[in-house]
Amino acid sequence: MLHAVETAFYQKHVLVVGDLMLDRYLWGDVTRISPEAPVPVVHMQRESHRCGGAANVASNLAKLGLHTSIVGFVGEDSDGQVLISALQESGIDTHGILPLAGWSTITKTRVIGGHQQILRMDRETPLADTAHASQLLHQQVMPMLEGEQRPHVIILSDYAKGVLSFELCQALIVRARNLGIPVLVDPKGRDYARYRHATALSPNRGELRGVTGVEDGDLNTLLDAGESLRQSLDVAFLAVTLSEQGIALVDGSEHPRRIPAMAQEVYDVSGAGDTVIATLGAGLAAGLTRLDALHLANLAAGVVVGKLGTAAIDLNELRGALLTDATYEQSDKIANWAHAKQQIARWHAQGEKVVFTNGCFDLLHAGHVTYLEHARRLGQRLVLGLNTDASVSRLKGPERPLIQEQDRARVLAALAAVDLVVLFEQDTPLELIEQLRPDILAKGADYREDQVVGGDLVRRWGGRVALVQLVQGRSTTGIVQRISAQK
C-alpha cells in the first residue's frame, strides 16, 4: 500500500488548524524518596522539547513527507519561539502562526524518572477575547484556501482551548466543502455542532460516549449512537478510536467496520490521536479509500504508542509496520472453504462487493498480476480460486504444475490485489462458486460470457460476469514451451 501512495505524499499539501502546544520533557533517574515528603527525588539529566497538540499533527504529516502548513496561536514568549523553531526544523510552513499578546504558549511539562512519567505540569492562559482571536485566525486562514497552493486536506485539531470557535469552524468547513477540500476533525467537548458538514470526525471511545450520552452499554450500542450523530451532523464518516480494540469506521454501512489494534507493546498513548488523524488525512490526500486510509492510520498508531512521550511516525517506521502487517495477513489470506465463506459473509455485511476469479497460476508472471489487478478493481475484494496440484495435472498434463500448490498459494497471497486464496481440487470451480456466492465472476476476455463456468449461478443471485482483458504474449504455457525449446 505504502509504495502506491508514498510518491503522492510528497505531492500533497495538508493544512492543520488548531491548538498549538509545546511538550517539554525533564528526564532523570529516581534512586530514593525525599526525606521531606513521600515523593521520589529525580536526579535531572537532560531536557527535551516536542511538538504537541495541533503541532504534533503537523509534525506527523511532515515526517510522512507531505507539504504541511499550520495555523494557530503562540504566546509572545520563549516557549512560543521554541515551538516555532521545532516546527520549522521539521520543514513545516509556520507563516500561519500568530504570536498573541498577553497570552502564554500552552506548555505541558512532564517529569520522567526511569522511563516512567512521574508528574505533568500544564501552563496555559485562557483566551481573554475569543471573538477577537477567532477573527484574527479567520483573516489568517481563509486566504490559504484559495489559489494554486490551496491544501488537498484540512485537519482541525481541537483541544478545547478556545482557538476553534463555532464561527471559525463553520466558516472553514463551509468554504472547504464548496471548494471540494475534505475537512477532518479531531474533536473535543460535548458540543459537536461546530463540526457540522465536516468530512470526518475522529473521537475516541470516551469522547463519543460523552457527546452521545451513551455512558453504559456495549460497543455496538455506542457505535449505533455514533451513526445517529454522524447523520445529524451531515458528516461522511466517523473514525472512532477504541484503544486496544483498534478503530471503527462508522459511515452509514449496515455494520460499522472494525480494524483491530496492531500495537505489540504500549508504553505511552500521548499523541496517538494526533497520529491517527494525521495519517488518515495523509492517506485521503494520497487517494486512498477511507477504509485503507484508516488501516494505515491504525498501523501508525500502533507504532507511536510503543514510544515514550508524545511522538510522531515517519515513513521508515510506517514501511516497517506495513511489512509486519503483510507478513501476518499473508498467512491469513490462504483459507479453506469454510473460512472463506465466513469471511465473504463479513465483507457482504460491510457492504463490500466480492469478485471471484480462478485459475492454475503456475509460474506467476506479469500477465497474471495485471489481470488480477484489473479484476480487483471490479469490486472491493478479490477471492482467487486456485486449482490444486491434482486438478492442474488433470487439466494440463502430468508434467504440470511446475510449482506446488502451497507455493503458488503463498506467492498469490503476497499480492496486494488478492484478498483471499482458496484451493479447489475439482476440474472446475463451480462447486466453490456455489458455496462462496460472489457478486462478480471475473474471467479472461479470451472466453465468451456463456463459456464462463458458474456464470448462470452468479446471475441467478443478482451478480454478474465480467471479462477482463489479458496482456498479449504473456502465458505460462508459452513460457514453458520456450524453456523446453532451449534445452
From Swiss-Prot:
Pathway: Nucleotide-sugar biosynthesis; ADP-L-glycero-beta-D-manno-heptose biosynthesis; ADP-L-glycero-beta-D-manno-heptose from D-glycero-beta-D-manno-heptose 7-phosphate: step 1/4; Nucleotide-sugar biosynthesis; ADP-L-glycero-beta-D-manno-heptose biosynthesis; ADP-L-glycero-beta-D-manno-heptose from D-glycero-beta-D-manno-heptose 7-phosphate: step 3/4
Key word Nucleotidyltransferase present: yes
UniProt xrefs under InterPro entries: Bifunc_HldE, Carboh/pur_kinase_PfkB_CS, Cyt_trans-like, PfkB_dom, RfaE_dom_I, RfaE_dom_II, Ribokinase-like, Rossmann-like_a/b/a_fold
Catalysed reaction equations from the record: D-glycero-beta-D-manno-heptose 7-phosphate + ATP = D-glycero-beta-D-manno-heptose 1,7-bisphosphate + ADP + H(+); D-glycero-beta-D-manno-heptose 1-phosphate + ATP + H(+) = ADP-D-glycero-beta-D-manno-heptose + diphosphate
Binding site residues for ATP: 204-207
Positions of the catalytic residues: 274
GO cellular component: cytosol
Region (Cytidylyltransferase): 356-487
PROSITE patterns the UniProt entry points to: PFKB_KINASES_1
GO molecular function terms noted in the UniProt entry: ATP binding; heptose 7-phosphate kinase activity; heptose-1-phosphate adenylyltransferase activity; phosphotransferase activity, alcohol group as acceptor
Disulfide bonds: none
GO terms, biological process: ADP-L-glycero-beta-D-manno-heptose biosynthetic process
EC number: 2.7.1.167, 2.7.7.70
Keywords: ATP-binding, Carbohydrate metabolism, Kinase, Multifunctional enzyme, Nucleotide-binding, Nucleotidyltransferase, Transferase
UniProt-listed Pfam families: CTP_transf_like (PF01467), PfkB (PF00294)
Region (Ribokinase): 1-329
Family classification: In the N-terminal section; belongs to the carbohydrate kinase PfkB family. In the C-terminal section; belongs to the cytidylyltransferase family.
Subunit structure, interactors included: Homodimer.
Function: Catalyzes the ADP transfer from ATP to D-glycero-beta-D-manno-heptose 1-phosphate, yielding ADP-D-glycero-beta-D-manno-heptose.
Identification of the protein by name: Bifunctional protein HldE
Lineage per the UniProt record: Bacteria, Pseudomonadati, Pseudomonadota, Alphaproteobacteria, Magnetococcales
